[in-house]
């Protein structure tokens, strides 16, 4: 019998020192809260997950300007709790409500995300959900890739058995055809670039010129035909 406490018990203990500022999201599989320390007036993000995401163990040890700091990731009796840096800012999705990006602005954002992905991939993690809603532009202009709830450790031996990701951004291999790897994130980056420039999925409207060529290579059906690393994509940008 496990001696681990539950997610609810851990949260109750934490809330003796923090108060809930807002519920950022609530789904069947997860809940995300913004908390504020009652005495220190400092904010953090609390993620309650109903399954263990192994990638968070690695993320606790990873540092990058373009990734949020993960303070702790505790496996509990009925799930996992993640304590994460709160970043004040707006998402790329929020920015796009005011209009499309120009190439220079999109390049700045994607180059930063490429840096984040390079760090993840070097540590054996594939993000699997790169999209405008998961990229924050901080009040200071820092570009940060967030939300690792469906990230996985890279394995060449197992294919994805559960369809995960966001429709339109998910690569063919995320449908269970084969194992996801670093090139899965490259596919999503191509869709992201196209959406930022045109407001449309590349299957509807392809970006013009150099950007369109980059998008086509990123979103090739065969992963071998895509950029083989985030660094190679950054160089192409």
Language-model region placement:
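Conserved HRD-motif arginine in the catalytic loop of eukaryotic-like protein kinases
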Residues: 226
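Conserved HxN/HPN-centered segment at the entrance to the catalytic loop
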Residues: 63-72
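Activation segment signature within eukaryotic-like protein kinase domains
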Residues: 109-110
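ATP-binding glycine-rich loop module of kinase domains
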Residues: 21-57
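Conserved short submotifs of the Hanks-type protein kinase catalytic core
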Residues: 77-91
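Catalytic-loop of the protein kinase fold
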Residues: 121-137
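Conserved activation segment of eukaryotic-like protein kinases, specifically the C-terminal portion
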Residues: 160-173
């Amino acid at each position: 019998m496990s001696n681990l406490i539950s997610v609810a018990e851990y949260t109750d203990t934490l809330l003796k020192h923090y108060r809930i500022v807002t519920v950022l999201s609530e789904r069947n599989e997860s809940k995300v809260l913004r908390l504020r320390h009652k005495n220190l007036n400092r904010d953090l993000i609390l993620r309650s997950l109903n399954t263990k995401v192994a990638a968070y163990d690695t993320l606790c040890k990873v540092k990058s300007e373009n990734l949020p700091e993960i303070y702790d990731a505790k496996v509990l009796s009925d799930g996992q709790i993640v304590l994460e840096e709160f970043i004040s800012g707006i998402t790329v999705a929020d920015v796009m409500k005011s209009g499309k990006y120009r190439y220079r602005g999109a390049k700045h954002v994607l180059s930063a995300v490429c840096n984040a992905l390079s760090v993840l991939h070097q540590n054996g993690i594939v993000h699997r959900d790169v999209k405008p809603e998961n990229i924050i532009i901080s009040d200071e202009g820092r570009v940060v890739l967030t939300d690792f709830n469906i990230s996985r450790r890279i394995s060449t031996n197992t294919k994805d058995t559960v369809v995960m990701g966001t429709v339109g951004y998910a690569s063919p291999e995320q449908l269970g055809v084969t194992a996801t790897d670093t090139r899965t994130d490259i596919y999503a980056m191509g869709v992201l670039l196209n959406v930022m420039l045109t407001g449309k999925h590349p299957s509807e409207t392809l970006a013009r010129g150099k950007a369109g060529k980059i998008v086509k290579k990123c979103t090739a059906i065969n992963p071998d035909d895509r950029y083989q690393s985030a660094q190679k994509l950054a160089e192409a940008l």
